[in-house]
């Protein structure tokens, strides 16, 4: 079965929350007459997730992509603004910038497979408005360094936490370092509602704007129609009560999920230490999610030989998350030639980020909690794997590496 750890632990808790919604007969967040829209499953999820991560506010959405758009809108990112984002990420981190009529500026990663803070300042121009660090594969970015740069240049920071729900950096939850955090509850994420997401922040104005953008302009106090009292032009990105029910049950399981993943990853990793020609990606903080173990080979040739024998692929060739494979970005395939992204003088091309290319040609993902061929992680273990199963997977990987 493919999916994230949350999809492996569905049980009675999710069923109970779902049946509550079915029996109430109100699937819409505001669907119970006379009941405040902040009393249902979605609202309870927002409250409990905010408490767990340390946000003052959480806004539930229908997708991580929607979460990113709401964050950009809340900050007023728009026509011709430049936003710095790594070249190794899911396409939504880049495409949402374009959707807001802004210009993505692609940045190099380092051997943590997250944005390299030392390469950010050289990309800043008078048009730069924000940085989007992506906590890729559940590994926190170096947020202290990134925040120093942002403060120095008066830039906003949107943390893309879509693959890192519950991760921490230096004791502080990912998503709480910057101005806003965007999170995903997709099936391949740490916890899941199939599709879904949320925005986290603590600033009142940003909260009101993010909420309004995701709910047709309504303010968070929405009760019925608010003619003359809307905060911003928005669209519909709301989460429904069925998704909210699953999100609530999964949120309550998140601490246990993370603890289990970290323990199982540590066991797998301990048996692969000290092998010739290979190490691991740098983990910026042990508060990472533990969803994947990334092998980093000394050479592209060794990585390719390993993949051939293991029946997998290096990250560079896994498909979904590498800028080289995003032809609609590279070729500026916007829905109209009048789009500022299409007209901007900035060009995009394969291999424009040589450091990123080199790292990803040598990197191989082994699943721990996220089983996803799109991440190059179709082989490995999952959250329910036993000690014996983990030992066997480790032995198989060792045998292949030693035979290279």
Identify what each model region corresponds to.
Residues 332-404:
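PLP-dependent enzyme catalytic core of the Aspartate aminotransferase-like
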Residues 164-170, 177-291:
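Active-site region of PLP-dependent enzymes
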Residues 210, 304-311, 394-397:
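Short amphipathic alpha-helices in soluble, non-transmembrane regions
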Residues 280-351:
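Conserved PLP-binding catalytic core of the aspartate aminotransferase-like
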Residues 26-35, 39-82, 96-98, 106, ...:
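Phosphate-binding glycine-rich loop
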Residues 73-161, 168:
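PLP-dependent aminotransferase-like
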Residues 1-34, 366-368, 372-374:
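N-terminal "arm"/small-domain region of PLP-dependent enzymes with the aminotransferase-like
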Residues 217-218, 310-317, 397-404:
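A common structural junction motif
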């Amino acid at each position: 079965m493919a999916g994230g750890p949350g999809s492996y632990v569905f049980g009675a808790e999710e069923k109970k929350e779902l049946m509550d919604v079915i029996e109430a007969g109100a699937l819409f967040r505001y669907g119970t007459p006379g009941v405040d829209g902040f009393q249902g499953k979605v609202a309870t999820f927002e409250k409990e997730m905010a408490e767990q991560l340390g946000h003052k506010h959480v806004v539930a959405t229908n997708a991580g992509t929607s979460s990113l758009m709401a964050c950009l809108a809340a900050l007023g990112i728009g026509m011709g603004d430049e936003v710095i984002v790594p070249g190794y990420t899911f396409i939504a981190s880049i495409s949402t910038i374009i959707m807001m009529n802004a210009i993505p500026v692609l940045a190099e990663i380092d051997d943590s497979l997250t944005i390299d803070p030392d390469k950010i300042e050289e990309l800043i121009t008078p048009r730069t408005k924000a940085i989007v660090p992506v906590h890729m594969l559940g590994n926190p970015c170096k947020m202290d360094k990134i925040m120093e740069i942002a403060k120095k240049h008066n830039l906003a920071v949107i943390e893309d936490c879509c693959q890192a729900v519950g991760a921490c950096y230096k004791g502080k939850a990912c998503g709480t370092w910057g101005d806003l955090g965007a999170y995903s509850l997709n099936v391949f994420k740490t916890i899941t509602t199939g599709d879904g997401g949320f925005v986290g922040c603590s600033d009142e104005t940003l909260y009101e704007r993010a909420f309004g953008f995701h709910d047709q302009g309504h303010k968070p106090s929405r009760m019925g129609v608010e003619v003359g009292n809307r905060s911003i032009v928005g669209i519909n990105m709301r989460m429904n009560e069925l998704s909210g029910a699953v999100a609530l049950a999964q949120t309550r399981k998140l601490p246990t999920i993370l603890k289990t993943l970290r323990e199982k990853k540590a066991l797998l990793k301990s048996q692969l230490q000290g092998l010739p020609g290979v190490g691991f990606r740098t983990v910026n903080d042990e508060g990472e999610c533990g969803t994947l173990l990334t092998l980093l080979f000394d050479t592209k040739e060794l990585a390719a030989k390993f993949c051939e024998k293991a029946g997998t692929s290096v990250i560079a060739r896994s498909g979904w998350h590498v800028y080289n494979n995003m032809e609609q970005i590279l070729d500026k395939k916007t829905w109209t030639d009048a789009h500022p992204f299409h007209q901007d003088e900035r060009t995009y091309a394969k291999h424009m980020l040589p450091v990123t290319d080199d790292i990803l040609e040598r990197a191989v993902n082994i699943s721990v909690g996220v089983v996803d061929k799109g991440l190059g992680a179709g082989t490995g273990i999952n959250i329910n794997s036993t000690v014996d199963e983990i030992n066997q997977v480790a032995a198989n990987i060792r045998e292949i590496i030693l035979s290279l």
